[in-house]
């Protein structure tokens, strides 16, 4: 096991998996997780293709690759600057709350 936050897309359709992946990336940026795992399965590769096409277009993604030990899983690395921007926004909001 890789102990990364994991999204399992087994049983999902291509169009719904796009929404789930985007939400999963957003959630993990908020949580400051640099690496995540998206499980698409091996099968015919439809979900894998959908996920990889989505990741290829997402400017927040540094890189992605098939997990060496589990070819049904893609490891995704989020660019550090997106994690830091979110952290700075969070800290700024925390200061506003503290001032009240």
Predicted regions and their residues:
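Long, charged, low-complexity intrinsically disordered regions
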Residues: 1-100
């Amino acid at each position: 096991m890789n102990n990364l936050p994991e999204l399992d897309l087994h049983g999902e359709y291509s169009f719904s998996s796009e929404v789930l992946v985007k939400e999963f990336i957003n959630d993990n940026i908020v949580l400051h997780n640099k690496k995540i795992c998206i499980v698409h399965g091996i099968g015919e590769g439809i979900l894998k293709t959908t996920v990889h096409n989505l990741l290829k277009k997402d400017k927040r993604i540094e890189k992605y690759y098939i997990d060496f030990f589990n070819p049904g899983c893609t490891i995704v690395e989020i660019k550090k600057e997106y994690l830091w921007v979110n952290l700075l926004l969070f800290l700024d909001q925390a200061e506003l709350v503290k001032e009240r």
